[in-house]
Amino acid sequence: MGILHVHAAATAHELQDIHLVTEALEWFTESEWDVDMTTSYHGPKVAMLSTQIKKKKQLDAFLEKLEPHHPTILAELDARMDENNVIHLRFSLESVIGQKVELMQTYEKGPLIKVRIKLAVYPGQDVQSIASDIFG
């Protein structure tokens, strides 16, 4: 497969329906999300949501939802990948609530889901070819 794991995180404010947001996130990743309630600097409660995907079946389902964005991810791979072979993606939280997957650019504002995809790259392997196998 070439992916070790996927980590995703989002936030929801007290005024939002946290249950609805969590359901949408579970649809998006096919995994359960941890909800950690905390208080923001300004006072209202905020839900810190996170999940980790490691199982092949869940990874395959998640990658299938990203399929319309595979060409964009490959084209922007140099900008989105760090030195630890982690691909950083941002998706619109509002679109996921509507069960659509929209990749966001770094300059776009709004509620988002941060996704980090850790690639399995071993000495002698080319990161570009591994990414092409996954997203190609």
Name each model feature, range by range.
Residues 35-58:
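Short, charge-patterned binding micro-sites
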Residues 14-15, 52-58, 122-124:
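Helix N-cap motif at beta-to-alpha junctions
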Residues 65-100:
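Mid-chain, well-packed structural core segment of small domains
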Residues 91-136:
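Glycine-rich, aromatic-bearing surface loops/beta-hairpins
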Residues 6-10, 49, 83-90, 113-118:
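Short glycine-/aliphatic-rich beta-strand segments at the starts of folded cytosolic domains
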Residues 28-33, 69-73, 107-112, 135-136:
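A common structural junction motif
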Residues 21-26, 62-69, 131-134:
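Short amphipathic alpha-helices in soluble, non-transmembrane regions
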Residues 1-35:
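Long, hydrophobic N-terminal alpha-helical segment
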